[in-house]
Each structure stands twice: as C-alpha cells, then as structure tokens.
C-alpha cells in the first residue's frame, strides 16, 4: 500500500478507528430436509437487530441473507454482489455460516474443495470444470490467528475439511468466483453448533465478535 492509499484509508476510518470501507456480508442456510429450524438462518436474520442492540460499530456495515440449501446458493451469491452497498464498498468480507450437528465447537474452515456431493438429489460433480475434483482453495485469512483470538469466547477450532455438501459448495464458489477474482472480496466459512450446544445469544455474540476481530485485523493492513 503506498502513502497516498494509506492516507485515504485513514481519512475514511470511523471515529473508533475501524475501517469504514469494510462491509460484511453474513450468510446462513435455510431449513432443509430434517433440519426444520436452521441455526444459521436465525443468526443471519437476527444479526442486524443484535448489532443495533449492542451498539456495535458494524451495525451500518453489514448485509445478511439466508440462502437455499441447493445449487441456488450460487445464484444467491451473485445476487448479493449486485447489492448497491456491496458494489460501492471498498472491501467486502463474505462470512458464510453452516450448521454442524456433531460439533461442540465453532469451526473456522480454512479451505474448500472442488466437489459437491448431494445424496438426497443423487448428485456428485465438480463445482468448477476447469479444476480437478481434488483441488482446493484456501481463505486469505489467517485462520489460526483468528482461532487464538476467538477461543476465549467459546471453544474454537480450525477445520481443514468442510465436507462436500452445500457448506463446502458455497465456500468454494465464494473463494473461486469472488475472492480469487478481486482483491476487494475476502471469504471465510464458519461452522456453528446447534442452539442446544450454544444458545442463540451466545452464538450471536460469537459471530459479532468474529466480525469485529476480522475488522480490527483488516484495519491494521
């Protein structure tokens, strides 16, 4: 970053020192199959209200969407990119969430693979045809550093396997179509436990803190 760019970034910073040019796009998944109430849909739909209630600095810098658990997730991603606030933002962080019934921790996913497996629809295929099935893309965020900053809030681990269902699908699409194509976009995926493991308020607070932590780190760059 040259001196002119750094000066311009400082001029648009918020009074609290955070970067006003970083917009967060938070996505969760809708109900599907045996999951009638998806934890991530509730978090996505309730996050703006939570940020308002807690007077978070991010309240005016977030867009949210609950998306279908299907290949339509790719269309939803493209739709989000056409959001006027996303278009005008200087930097955008896509934070995708998925539900993991078996985990008792928050799982920060480091990477996604070029493979989709949907047993219900008898579907197995590569996501991007100019890459191999075993190819993977990694987030540009330092997941180990994020884990260290988040582990005091709730048990947090770094995962290197987002499985091959639609969590992996949306993450790979996001990394391939957005983060790889433009420095404006960065992507991260978070697997969350059920509300039975970590209640809704706890999860709201965790996700909000994760975004604020990312915001802090990006402000240092």
Regions found by a protein language model. Give the residues of each.
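N-terminal catalytic or cofactor-binding beta/alpha core of small enzyme domains
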Residues: 2-165, 175-184, 205-206, 212-220
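A structured phosphate/pyrophosphate-recognition subdomain
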Residues: 187-194
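A short acidic/glycine-rich loop-to-helix N-cap element
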Residues: 198-205
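A generic structural motif
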Residues: 31-32, 194-198
């Amino acid at each position: 970053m040259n001196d002119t760019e750094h000066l311009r970034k400082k001029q648009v910073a918020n009074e609290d020192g955070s970067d006003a040019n970083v917009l967060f796009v938070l996505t969760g998944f809708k109900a599907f199959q045996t999951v009638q109430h998806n934890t991530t849909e509730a978090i996505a739909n309730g996050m703006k209200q939570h940020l308002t209630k807690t007077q978070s600095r991010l309240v005016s810098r977030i867009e949210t969407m609950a998306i279908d658990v299907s290949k339509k997730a790719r269309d939803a991603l493209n739709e989000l990119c056409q959001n006027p606030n996303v278009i005008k933002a200087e930097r955008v962080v896509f934070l995708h969430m998925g539900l993991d019934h078996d985990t008792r921790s928050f799982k920060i996913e480091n990477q996604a693979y070029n493979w989709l497996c949907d047993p219900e629809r008898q579907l197995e295929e590569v996501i991007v045809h100019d890459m191999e099935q075993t190819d993977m893309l990694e987030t540009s965020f330092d997941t180990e550093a994020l884990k260290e900053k988040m582990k005091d809030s709730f048990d947090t681990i770094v995962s290197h396997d987002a499985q091959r269902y639609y969590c992996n699908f949306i993450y790979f699409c996001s990394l391939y179509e957005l983060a790889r194509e433009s420095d404006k976009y960065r992507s991260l995926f978070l697997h969350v436990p059920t509300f039975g493991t970590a209640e809704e308020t706890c999860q709201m607070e965790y996700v909000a803190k994760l975004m604020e932590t990312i915001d802090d780190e990006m402000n240092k760059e």
